[in-house]
C-alpha cells in the first residue's frame, strides 16, 4: 500500500512538474523575458554605420540635374544624352557631398576615378580589368550596371550607392530610341543602333529594406559547409523558429532607398546602408522587405501574363500584357478590379462586354479580356513614383546662349503634385540665364529709362518740397551703433559674416550678383540679386534703421514694419476716403532707377536728416551705391549704373520713398499744393502701391515715365470691386478688410520649393502650415493645404528654419496679427474667375480635395488652360519656346519683358447675367441688405482709427498710389506681381 502511495505521489509530482514547466515555457512572462534578452543581444551586436543619416540628407539636398549632350548623329542620341546626364548628376552629387566616386564599369570618360571594371558584355572588352580598393571615403556610382551585379554583396559592404537604372512602370512600352518587353521576369531591351540586352530588374520600391550577405572568404564558406554537414544548421534553424534567435547567422544590412525621376521608366536610385546585424538574432522578414528581383509574371494554365502596379499622381495604375508582347494596356487599378468583378459575376462574357465595361478601345480591351479569360490571380509588384525636380528653363538665342552645349543646374523641387495641371517654372543656374538677367533686368531697363527721362525745373522744385516734407527739420539724425545692426541680423549666415568682418573696417566696393532662385508663371528674365560688401551693408544699415525708426514709421503712406492686420486696416481706411482705387505696376523697378531719383530724392532725404558729424561718412556710403563695378557668380562683368542694388540696405525704404514720390509728383502736376499732394499719396510698400483715383491714368504713367520708370495702370477699381495690394486680393475693401493670397500665382507654385537644404517632407508641412495661417479660409488654397496635411505625417516646424515660406509668418508679431479673413461665399467667385473657371467647376474640385484620402502623390489636380506667354525664348520641357514677337509688341504696345502676365481676373466688378457690371454677389441682395459674412469696417468720420496705422486723411477729392506685388522680406522686397511670370 505504501509502495502504491509512493508511486502515485511520484507520478503526481512528475505530472505537476511537467505541467508547471510547460505552462512556464509557454507563459507570456518567459516569452517577454526571452524577447527582452533578444533585444539586448541585438542592441549589443548591431552596428550603426557612421554618417548614414548625414549622407542620405546630403544626397537628397544635392540632387540637382546636370544635363550633358552627345554629338549629333549618335545612333541613340536621346538615350545616350539621358544616360550621360545621369552619370554627371551622380558624380556631382558625390563630390558636392564631400566624398569620392567609386564607379563600377566606368566609361573611358570616368577613367580618372577609382572603380571596378569587369566583363559583363561585349562592349566591356574595350577596357582592361581593374578593381580598386573601396574605402569609407567612397560612394559607389553605377550607370545601367546594377542588373549584372550581386546587389546583396555590394550593399553588404556598407558603402552608399548611387545608380541610374531602368525601373519600368509598365510591362512593355517605348523608351528613348527603342522599346522593351518582358519575358520570364527578364526585360528585353532594344535600342536603335543595335543595342539588345536582357536582364532582371531589382525591386527598389520600399523606403527601407534589408539584404542578407553570404560568406565571401574561404574559411567562412568552409565553416558554413561543415555546419550544414553536421546538422548544426538544421538545429539552429529549429531554435530560430521557436525562439526567434539562434547561434551563428549571416550578416544583415539595413538601408534606405530614395528614387529621383530622370525620364520615362528611368530613375536615379540612392541606397544608403545605416545598420548591420546578424540574421540569427531577429526574424528579419517580419521587420521589412528584403531586396529581391521584380516579379512580373502571373502564371496560369492558359497564358502567361505580366502585370505591374504603378502609383501615379492620379492613383494606382495597373499595366497588363502577354509575356514577350509589345502590346500592353494600362488602366486605373480600381477600373480593372470593377471589370474583373463584373466578368466573374456574369454568366456569359464576350469581348464586347469587356469593351463596354472598361471603356477602352477594342484593341486594349482585347488584352484585358484575354487576361480575364486566363483567370490570373494577380499579385503584381508595386512601383512607386519617384520625387521629381520642378520644371526649369534656360535662355536661348544668339544673345545669351553662346555655348549650345551648356546645361544649367536645376535646384527647385516638388513636395507634391501641383494643385493645377499648369505649374510654375524656374530658371536654371547657367551662364546664358545670367546674360539674360543682366540684359533683361539691368542693361535693357537702364537704357530704356534714360531714353524716357525728362526732368524739368518744376520737377526739381517738387522734389525739394517732398524732401522737406518728409524731413522738416534738418540735421537731427544719428546712426545706430553697429552692435544694434548685428543684433537685428540673427540668421546664422549673417552672424558668421559679422564675426568674420568685425575687426576689418576697410573694404573694396565690388557688387557680387547672382540670379534669384524663384518661381515664375511662365519663362521670364530671371531677377538679379546684387550683394554689396558686408561692411558697406552694416554701416549703411546703421543709418537706415535709425531713419526708419525716427521718420518713416511715422508717415501714413509707409507700410513696411506694420503687421498684416495693420496693413489691411490701412487699405480699408484708404478705400473709405475715396470712391475709386488705383493699382499700378512698375516694370523692372530696380533696373529703372536713374541718377535724379537716387541723388535728388533718395540720397537728399538721408543727407538732410543726418547730423553734420556723420554727413561725410553717409555721403561716401551712398556714393558707393552708384556705378560700382559688378560681377556675376559665373564671372560675367557688368555695369549696374544707377540701378537699385537689390542686396543693399536701401532697397525696401528707397523703393518705398521712390514709389511715394511718383504719386506725390503726379498729385502736384495735377494742381494740388504740397499738403494736399502729400495727403493723397496713398500707401506704399517697396514698389507695391495703392492710391485713390483722383489723378488720371495718363498723368500717372507720364509722370513716372519722365523719371525713367515704366508704370502701367493695372486696375482702376470702383467701390465694391476687388482690389489687390501686396499680392493679396481684397474682395471689397470699402466694406471688409478680408483678403486672400492671389490664387492663380499661388497655386502655380504652392507645391514647389527652392529650399535645397531641408527635408522635402518637412518643407511640405511647413509651407502648407504657413498658408493655413494666412489663408485657411481661401477657397482651393486652404482646401489643398488641408488635404496635403491630412494625408501625410504631422510635424512640428519652426518657421525660422525655412527660407521658402511666406514672409508674413516668419515674425511672431505678424503671426499674432495675420491677414483678416472671411468665409464669405463670394470668394469662390474671385478664385474661379482668376483661374478661368466657373464657380461650379471650382466647387466640384474642392469637393474632391475634401474627400481625398491616400498618398500625397495622388492629390487631385485641377485642369486649367490659361495662356501664359514666355517673356523670352527659352528651352523648357525639352522644347524651345519662343518669346513674344516684335510685331506683336509694336501692335499692342505691351512690353514683352514686363513682369506681369496678361491678368486673368476681372479687374472690375464681376459681370451679372445681364452683362452689366455688378459687385460680385452683392447685387443679388436687395437695397439695404448686407452680407452677414462681410463686416462693415468703414470708419465713421467721428471715429478715430482702430489701429496703430495712421489713416489717410480724407480731403475733398479722391486719392492716389501704385501697385506691385509680393514682398519676401522687410530687408529686401522683390518684385513678384499679381500675375507675374
UniProtKB/Swiss-Prot annotation:
Its EC number is 2.7.7.48. Residues 879-981 are annotated as: Disordered. The keyword Signal does not apply. GO terms for molecular function: nucleotide binding; RNA binding; RNA-directed RNA polymerase activity. Pfam families: Noda_Vmethyltr, RdRP_1. Residues 972-981 have a biased composition (Basic residues). Keywords: Nucleotide-binding, Nucleotidyltransferase, RNA-directed RNA polymerase, Transferase, Viral RNA replication. Transmembrane segments: none annotated. GO terms for biological process: DNA-templated transcription; viral RNA genome replication. Residues 883-898 have a biased composition (Polar residues). Belongs to the nodaviridae RNA polymerase family. This is RNA-directed RNA polymerase. It comes from Atlantic halibut nervous necrosis virus (AhNNV).
